[in-house]
């Protein structure tokens, strides 16, 4: 969709929203029927035009997909055996495109920022993901078609229902706003919260068969085992980051025991999606390029932030998303950091560098926005997070995640492994600290506590 079409669609969307608000106001004020019907008429006229644009998107997408398949840019894996959903191969042209993208990525980040590039194994012991939280929290909620056995993501069904419900020209502005809230938060709703709207989504979208209830969690990691006995459980990694965290001490020492430093990694990752869809946008195996930037937690300024501070980006802060009818707006990156929308110069620097990389890659800046995660959708490890989203025929799609993970991962692996994954700071002058120390009188404790004496001594030693 080119810029004029995009502008046209937004104008029509706003017209529909404004007029639906007017309809709701007239209905609430018990206006005369002819006046209310006249107000309803504009949304009904506008919606077919909007649908025509959406139809053009679908036709264009179908033509592109067929061309990419015919020219072997990308095609379904093991197609002679009918393939498996979510698995794709790159042909010669597709592989060349991938290599060119990764080459530019290395030039823009690894080379320019003097990062360490490493390659860690994809097979990972269970203990690693127990520590990181992935075993418990890397899940989606699913339901089952009780007739044909097909599985569906519960949040996708709820989102689809809400989007279709919003197309009803008779819906009130208040109900539309409530549906918008559900759509914005749907991927983060608990099974109980999804159950609150489940009576509207109790049948499968195509077969209309009944669906299981309530939704149950499904872990997205592929489980495996090591060795002949199968007693040591492992997983195929869903992200490359955990290898970098577990090896932190080695990289820190290699960097002269100095902060900050960054570790980059490109590799295959695996996610057992419940219902892969949207072609290459949701697959079960794909290439991920990640950077872990380690910085002093109390010194998150960045020496090169001034290089990107004046960039004006389409940004969608959390506060704006929580207001009805708002869109992303152009903000100066320096201003976004100064106002606290972005929590530090370091995070702001990488937002700016991602923007410059994507523009250099050929992404239209009018179709590129940075969306702030809402508080309820933040990952369990994040203190702040922004997504670079690109507008395509499927709408706004997340392509890059930029998160402040704080010390979550290093602290978790330190506690579980018993190895201190920490950095040390040399102070210009020593800091004197007064500490209350309890020195137990053992000859008094023995008679008083007898067999519990050891437990009492250990309790007194706790800071």
From Swiss-Prot:
Substrate binds at residues 153, 239, 286-290, 376. Signal peptide: none annotated. Its EC number is 6.1.1.14. Gene3D superfamilies: 3.30.40.230, Bira Bifunctional Protein, Domain 2. It holds the Pfam family tRNA-synt_2b. Residues 44-54 have a biased composition (Basic and acidic residues). ATP binds at residues 271-273, 281-286, 398-399. InterPro entries: aa-tRNA-synt_IIb (IPR002314), aa-tRNA-synth_II (IPR006195), aa-tRNA-synth_II/BPL/LPL (IPR045864), Gly-tRNA_synthase/POLG2 (IPR027031), GlyRS-like_core (IPR033731), tRNA-synt_gly (IPR002315). One of its GO terms (molecular function) is glycine-tRNA ligase activity. It comes from the Eukaryota. Residues 25-54 are annotated as: Disordered. One of its GO terms (cellular component) is cytoplasm. SUPFAM superfamilies: Class II aaRS and biotin synthetases. PROSITE patterns: AA_TRNA_LIGASE_II (PS50862). It catalyses: tRNA(Gly) + glycine + ATP = glycyl-tRNA(Gly) + AMP + diphosphate. It is found in: Cytoplasm. Keywords: Aminoacyl-tRNA synthetase, ATP-binding, Cytoplasm, Ligase, Nucleotide-binding, Protein biosynthesis. GO terms for biological process: diadenosine tetraphosphate biosynthetic process; glycyl-tRNA aminoacylation. Belongs to the class-II aminoacyl-tRNA synthetase family. Homodimer. Catalyzes the attachment of glycine to tRNA(Gly). Is also able produce diadenosine tetraphosphate (Ap4A), a universal pleiotropic signaling molecule needed for cell regulation pathways, by direct condensation of 2 ATPs. PANTHER family: GLYCINE--TRNA LIGASE, GLYCYL-TRNA SYNTHETASE/DNA POLYMERASE SUBUNIT GAMMA-2. This is Putative glycine--tRNA ligase, cytoplasmic. It comes from Arabidopsis thaliana (Mouse-ear cress).
């Amino acid at each position: 969709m080119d810029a004029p079409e995009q502008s046209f669609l937004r104008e029509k969307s706003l017209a529909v929203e404004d007029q639906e608000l007017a309809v709701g106001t007239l209905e609430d004020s018990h206006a005369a029927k002819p006046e209310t019907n006249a107000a309803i008429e504009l949304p009904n006229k506008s919606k077919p035009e909007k649908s025509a644009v959406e139809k053009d998107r679908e036709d264009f997408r179908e033509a592109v997909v067929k061309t990419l398949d015919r020219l072997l840019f990308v095609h379904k894996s093991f197609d002679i055996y009918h393939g498996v959903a979510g698995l794709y191969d790159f042909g010669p042209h597709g592989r060349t495109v991938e290599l060119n993208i990764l080459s530019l990525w290395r030039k823009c980040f690894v080379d320019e920022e003097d990062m360490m590039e490493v390659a860690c194994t994809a097979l990972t012991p269970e203990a690693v993901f127990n520590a990181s939280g992935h075993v418990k929290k890397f899940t989606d909620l699913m339901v089952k078609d009780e007739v044909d056995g097909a599985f569906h993501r519960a949040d996708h069904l709820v989102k689809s229902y809400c989007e279709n419900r919003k197309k009803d020209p008779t819906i009130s502005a208040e109900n539309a706003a409530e549906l918008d809230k559900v759509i914005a938060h749907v991927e983060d709703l608990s099974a109980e919260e999804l159950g609150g709207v489940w009576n509207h989504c109790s049948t499968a979208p195509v077969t209309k068969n009944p669906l299981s209830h309530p939704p149950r969690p499904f872990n997205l990691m592929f489980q495996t085992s090591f060795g002949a006995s199968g007693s040591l459980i492992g997983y195929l990694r869903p992200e490359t980051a955990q290898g970098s965290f577990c090896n932190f001490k080695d990289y820190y020492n290699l960097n002269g025991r100095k902060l900050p430093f960054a570790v980059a990694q490109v590799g295959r990752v695996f996610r057992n999606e419940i219902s892969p869809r949207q072609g290459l946008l949701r697959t079960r195996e794909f290439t991920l390029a990640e950077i872990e930037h380690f910085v002093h937690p109390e010194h998150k300024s960045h020496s090169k932030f001034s290089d990107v501070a004046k960039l004006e980006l389409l940004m969608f802060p959390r506060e704006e998303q929580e207001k009805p009818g708002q869109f992303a707006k152009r903000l100066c990156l320096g201003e976004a950091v100064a106002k606290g929308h972005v929590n530090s110069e370091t995070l702001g620097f990488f937002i700016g560098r991602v923007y410059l990389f994507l523009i250099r890659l050929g992404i239209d800046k009018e179709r590129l926005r940075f969306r702030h995660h809402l508080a309820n959708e933040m990952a369990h490890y994040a203190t702040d997070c922004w997504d670079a989203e690109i507008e395509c025929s499927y709408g706004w799609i997340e392509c890059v995640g930029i998160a402040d993970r704080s010390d979550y991962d290093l602290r978790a692996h330190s506690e579980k492994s018993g190895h201190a994954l920490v950095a040390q700071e040399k102070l210009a002058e020593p800091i004197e600290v007064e500490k209350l120390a309890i020195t137990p009188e053992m000859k008094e404790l023995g008679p008083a506590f007898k067999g519990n004496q050891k437990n009492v001594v250990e309790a007194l030693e706790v800071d």
